[in-house]
Regions:
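Cell-wall glycan-active module
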Residues: 1-207, 211-213, 217-290
């Protein structure tokens, strides 16, 4: 009882003591992005905009997600699951639900509904899973790996039995941090253009977002307003459908395209032979759906 009374007395004294005004509001949640903020402002972003973003309490290093980039990959996604009859039936239902935007995409870009649907199925299970990591944290953490301290934090987070060699890690980190900085700039530009709070956008640990899983530079280059509401929202199915079709058209999709050329076009979406062959197989099985 004596100890309890003493603790209460000390707590009252602490509460009565003066504290710096605004200390809680201005304290940075994470100091690892200071040099990154300087770079962004130097590259043309408004200082107030950048400071406001990075002082948000939800902004922090995405250590767990980014470490996945640097682990030995012992398994790959089971793409065969997407050709199961129950999954294909969901894809057929999706094609009926979004018949109009799919038809509009085919009219405007020449890409058949079954091809767009196949990509959406493999990417996000038709929008059911678009990722749960803050895109800002993922891209900022990768971009901040230009700083040796951040890079060491990522290295130490990787289990020893899953690590690349340190030389391989450094080489990959150099490539990834340059890529991520470009993606971060594109992401912030997109969020400003569409008046979206960048701290609220979730996606994959690689920084891809929306139903179509576009990376930010692809959003700026290829994303389209599919529902004619004056905005580009990759979490909206009509926008995602139009954006995928526009992307494929840009890389050479055309009417009556052969399988070999179709393979080359889709390979630009995801540089995996397994992925491309699965998309083409799904599209073939969906032919005739209306």
């Amino acid at each position: 009882m004596i100890m309890e009374t003493l603790l209460k007395y000390l707590l009252i004294l602490w509460m009565m003591a003066p504290h710096p005004i605004g200390a809680v509001q201005t304290e940075r949640p994470d100091a690892h992005f200071k040099s990154l903020e300087v770079r962004l402002v130097k590259d043309g972003f408004d200082r107030g905009f950048i400071q406001e973003i990075f002082k948000n309490q939800d902004v922090s290093l995405e250590v767990r997600g980014i470490s996945l980039f640097f682990m030995h990959q012992e398994s790959t996604l089971n793409y065969d699951q997407f050709t199961e009859s129950s999954i294909l039936n969901k894809a057929r239902t999706y094609m009926q639900t979004y018949r109009d935007p799919l038809a509009a995409a085919e009219k405007n870009y020449g890409v058949p509904p079954q091809v767009v649907t196949a990509i959406l199925l493999v990417e996000t299970r038709l929008g059911a899973y678009t990722g749960n990591r803050l895109v800002l944290n993922s891209l900022s953490t990768m971009a901040a790996m230009s700083d040796g301290g951040v890079r060491d934090i990522i290295w130490q987070s990787i289990p020893e039995n899953r690590r690349l060699t340190r030389e391989q890690f450094e080489k990959k980190a150099d490539q990834r941090t340059r890529w991520a900085y470009d993606q971060l700039k594109a992401f912030l530009s997109y969020s400003q253009r569409e008046a979206i709070d960048p701290v609220n956008i979730r996606g994959s640990y690689a920084g891809a977002l929306g139903v179509a899983q576009f990376i930010p530079t692809s959003i700026l280059a290829y994303a389209r307003d599919g529902n004619s509401d004056g905005r580009v929202d990759l979490f909206d199915h009509a926008d995602a459908i139009a954006s995928i079709a526009n992307f494929l058209k840009h890389y050479g999709w055309r009417e009556n395209i052969g399988r070999e050329d179709a393979y080359k076009v889709i390979f630009n979406y995801n540089r995996s032979s397994y992925y491309v062959n699965t998309v083409l197989e799904i599209a073939k099985k969906l032919e005739g759906t209306s």
